[in-house]
């Protein structure tokens, strides 16, 4: 019996998709080719973020022969727009059932074949998250490359963030981390690794391949008003939230004597 059908799900592979009709079929096939040889129970969760093309229809065509393939559709999507990556990831984490979640974009620029190496690195290091790093091999235009470098400088300055490529969506993490991230706020997907570290989780980086977009168009704005200014404001917001966070862990108090009292502890 195929690994994806036996036992509790270990790995969820999750990708948000907004108008990716030309990529979703190949995406599913590439994920299957990458994960099946790992011999672990898995599922694929695609988040349709308000697509106005045939993205959802093409996913549905694939589903009858693939019990491991699931699709969740975002609600309350603005007309002809998506809710954005942060919201889509937020919905995806709540739909995923695996102990671990591999995240990637649906545009095929992330290579699902990297997931196996990420799993091995997580096992070897004991890390809670493996963050992909495309900085050595980005297949983007000059504007986006320069924007990433500038963003990295500001993140290091304001957040002491040493992650080289926090904008790379290809990452592997424990699902519990995803459920604690404030992804219901726009723009927070850019700060997943640094936020995870702030929450006390360990993050390691792994160089990954980055492929040119094969079909469709980028969903990111390139102008200063679409990315630079909102990105700086998001940085300031994250810095403010970090300073305001307080521990919420608590231990229930009982009427039993404390351990040190029973053992004749300090008087």
Where are these predicted regions, by residue range?
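Terminal low-complexity segments of carbohydrate-biosynthetic enzymes
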Residues: 3, 40, 58, 124, ...
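Conserved donor NDP-sugar-binding/catalytic core segment of glycosyltransferases
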Residues: 116-142
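Acidic helix N-cap motif at the loop->helix transition within catalytic regions
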Residues: 22-26, 53-62
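Short aromatic/hydrophobic "clamp" motif used to bind/position activated sugar donors
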Residues: 101
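Conserved donor nucleotide-binding strand/loop of the catalytic core
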Residues: 42, 56-95
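N-proximal low-complexity "stem/linker" segments adjacent to membrane-targeting elements
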Residues: 1-33, 40
